[in-house]
């Protein structure tokens, strides 16, 4: 009898296991067929690409190309096309298949587009059926949640309407004083370091200090607090970013195991616990600020956004959990985007100015003639044409986010090309920004004067200049970011003359943003 029970249990387990694998095989098989359909549809329209393997697509080839890629030699920093070392597979296949080609990673089919006319079509497409890439946004959820950066469809459009209103140019003009105030402790610290250095000057690693300033600006503008109070939040975001980006988002496998079990290994970091701690800290900060704002008429950016969200409900009450989700997810987005991208852009700008001291002189002269006491304000910033040109050229050579990614939730037409539902579209911004056919033979050179008549006349295809992304999903905080970069560059250059330190190592790295792996070290005199 006991033996019969054992055999029965074993038989049941066998049936269950076979059933699970049968269902998994069936689902996986359907996914493979669907991917084949997408690839065939693109091929029939003349889109070529590397032949994929049945299980992992072109991942193995991508990894091989990456391992063989040559990194920067350091001979010519400015002309260095870092995209060929950070994203060598894109460059490798472009030489083989042209500016439009297709490839796959596991069960995901991708379409690479770097043709100016197709980028223009992509930029002018307003459909909600072209959103963020779902498998990447899912992976970035601990950092960004389902806020304005990662959400799709009507949910994204709703958040965009609420948040964009508070980031218009007129709204942010009043924050210039706050930006100057946040920068002063850093500038005073640098002045003391220069005094101690004497005639030889001193070496300063600027990127870390700039991150502190950017964090302070975001903390004050959004939550009425200082960086010191929000330091734990920024630290958690950096820890999450480091853990999640250890494995390239572009190499994600998306095969059978990912489909059934997910992919949640991120080294030794407990992502779930860190995410919960981050969200709790943000929520506590918001609730504390709500109480403080009851006793004052002065409201920070987040309070204004929340009021806009409440008005958008047309009298309907928010579900409590939905309200908290909206608050936390968009705080994550603002913390991350406002903190890192601005600091990185200013760091690259100082690196380029260190190599081009004549542009430091031009900026300094402009600031002295336009800004009272050499300090920019809301009235003088629009007159800083040279500063603007230098920043635009910096963002051409070193755009903060190097890639635009979209996924078609339905069949989408881009010009003469029909992109099948489920295809992920990629545009490599540095490749567009350094293309000689678009920018001329000096595309790799630092020449801010190319923007002397504005973006529309800076190159052959102005729609190819996309440092803040493209289309309706252009960065909602670009006015805020540009204003802060102008303020910081103006203040630094007006007070200091500098060159690159001999210890500087030029090594751009990719962690969602293109960052200086070893920092930016300048010699200030």
Curated annotation (Swiss-Prot):
Family matches, as CDD domains: CYP714
Main location as per UniProt: endoplasmic reticulum
SUPFAM superfamilies: Cytochrome P450
Membrane topology according to the record: Single-pass type III membrane protein
Tissues/organs with expression: Expressed in the shoot apical meristem (SAM) and petioles of young leaves, in the leaf margin and petiole vein of cotyledons, and at low levels in the filaments of developing flowers. Not detected in siliques.
Cellular component, GO, one term: endoplasmic reticulum membrane
Annotated binding of heme, by residue: 475
Chain ranges on the Lumenal side, renumbered to this chain: 1-3
Disruption phenotype: No visible phenotype; due to the redundancy with CYP714A1. Cyp714a1 and cyp714a2 double mutants flower earlier and have an increased plant size and biomass.
EC numbers: 1.14.-.-
GO molecular function: heme binding; iron ion binding; monooxygenase activity; oxidoreductase activity, acting on paired donors, with incorporation or reduction of molecular oxygen
Subcellular location: Endoplasmic reticulum membrane
UniProt cross-references to PROSITE patterns, sorted A to Z: CYTOCHROME_P450
InterPro entries in the record: Cyt_P450, Cyt_P450_CS, Cyt_P450_E_grp-I, Cyt_P450_sf, Cytochrome_P450_Monooxygen
UniProt keyword annotation of Ion transport present: no
Keywords, ordered alphabetically: Endoplasmic reticulum, Heme, Iron, Membrane, Metal-binding, Monooxygenase, Oxidoreductase, Signal-anchor, Transmembrane, Transmembrane helix
Cofactor: heme
Side Cytoplasmic, residues: 25-525
Translocase listed as a keyword: no
Pfam family membership, one: p450
Misc remark: Overexpression of CYP714A2 causes severe dwarfism with defective leaf development.
Job description of the protein: Involved in the inactivation of early gibberellin (GA) intermediates.
Family under the similarity heading: Belongs to the cytochrome P450 family.
Protein name in the entry: Cytochrome P450 714A2
Gene source species: Arabidopsis thaliana (Mouse-ear cress)
